[in-house]
Amino acid sequence: MVMAVYRCAKCGKEVELDLENTREVRCPYCGSKILYKPRPRVARRVKAI
């Protein structure tokens, strides 16, 4: 069982989906097909040249 957390583009709610058993990826709240993988809240520091 692979559970993944996504954020809906239309309503903005976080959705947890089982990708192995689900054929169609949709938001269960609004029915939107556009889901984004949320980025981690860790700030990255890049060394300037």
Swiss-Prot record:
Zn(2+) binds at C11, C27, C30. Part of the RNA polymerase complex. DNA-dependent RNA polymerase (RNAP) catalyzes the transcription of DNA into RNA using the four ribonucleoside triphosphates as substrates. It catalyses: RNA(n) + a ribonucleoside 5'-triphosphate = RNA(n+1) + diphosphate. It comes from Thermococcus onnurineus (strain NA1). The lineage of its organism: Archaea, Methanobacteriati, Methanobacteriota, Thermococci, Thermococcales. This is DNA-directed RNA polymerase subunit Rpo12. Belongs to the archaeal Rpo12/eukaryotic RPC10 RNA polymerase subunit family. Its EC number is 2.7.7.6. Keywords: Cytoplasm, DNA-directed RNA polymerase, Metal-binding, Nucleotidyltransferase, Transcription, Transferase, Zinc. One of its GO terms (biological process) is DNA-templated transcription. GO terms for molecular function: DNA binding; DNA-directed RNA polymerase activity; zinc ion binding. Binds 1 zinc ion. Its cofactor is Zn(2+). It is found in: Cytoplasm. One of its GO terms (cellular component) is DNA-directed RNA polymerase complex.
